[in-house]
Amino acid sequence: MAEKENTKRNRREEILQALAQMLESSDGSQRITTAKLAANVGVSEAALYRHFPSKTRMFDSLIEFIEDSLTTRINLILQDEKETFNRLRLILLLILGFAERNPGLTRIMTGHALMFEQDRLQGRINQLFERIESQLRQVLREHKLRDGKGFQHDETLLASQLLAFCEGMLSRFIRSEFRYRPTQEFDTRWPLLAAQLN
């Protein structure tokens, strides 16, 4: 029984990995059909549906992986790092680095891969980025409590500016067909971003 569960779990992971790889390839700029995905995995469409009731559930699983990966690591950053600017830098670097290591998932994070899918999938990605922006805003607000001084501009504006930088770098990554890495020149860009906060 346990062996059967492991086989099923492995097949599910294989399907999700194939979908992520297709999103990374030139197929990712077009709608990915279950027929194409099944052919890529080497199974029938019926076999796909034994593991996932719909393509939407496949995307849900990939979004869940993105959410878990980012939120878990952001929480670790907030737990381990207390200095405001280091927290912000590490969170941005996390988002950019995750995208760089997972190009196919970057198409989901930017919404490119979801254009032909159910609206609620884009809603989940929107909620993820809203949560990240909220965490950035909280880090900025805690700076005032911790250091006794705030920022020249409103924390909401600053948090959205930082997140917009990340989103722009992810879009550039896709537009360049994954040639322009999101973390490229980050060490040069960070002081420019940090200067905007003061």
UniProtKB/Swiss-Prot annotation:
Gene3D superfamilies recorded: Tetracycline Repressor, domain 2 (1.10.357.10)
> What processes does the entry annotate via GO biological process terms?
cell division; negative regulation of division septum assembly
Quick check: keyword Magnesium in the entry? no
Residue ranges flagged as DNA-binding region: 33-52
The alphabetical list of record keywords is:
Cell cycle, Cell division, Coiled coil, Cytoplasm, DNA-binding
Return the Pfam families for the record.
SlmA-like_C (PF22276), TetR_N (PF00440)
Q: Give the UniProt entry's GO cellular component terms.
A: bacterial nucleoid; cytoplasm
| Entry superkingdom | Bacteria
**Any coiled-coil ranges, and where?**
117-144
Boundaries of every HTH tetR-type domain copy: 9-70
UniProt subcellular location: Cytoplasm, Nucleoid
A single Gene Ontology molecular function, please?
A: transcription cis-regulatory region binding
Its main localization is cytoplasm
Q: What does this protein do?
A: Required for nucleoid occlusion (NO) phenomenon, which prevents Z-ring formation and cell division over the nucleoid. Acts as a DNA-associated cell division inhibitor that binds simultaneously chromosomal DNA and FtsZ, and disrupts the assembly of FtsZ polymers. SlmA-DNA-binding sequences (SBS) are dispersed on non-Ter regions of the chromosome, preventing FtsZ polymerization at these regions.
Q: Which HAMAP family does its entry note?
A: NO_factor_SlmA
What PANTHER family has UniProt attached to this entry? HTH-TYPE TRANSCRIPTIONAL REGULATOR RUTR (PTHR30055), NUCLEOID OCCLUSION FACTOR SLMA (PTHR30055:SF183)
The record describes its quaternary structure and partners as: Homodimer. Interacts with FtsZ.
Sequence similarity: Belongs to the nucleoid occlusion factor SlmA family.
Protein name (database record): Nucleoid occlusion factor SlmA
Give the originating organism: Pectobacterium atrosepticum (strain SCRI 1043 / ATCC BAA-672)
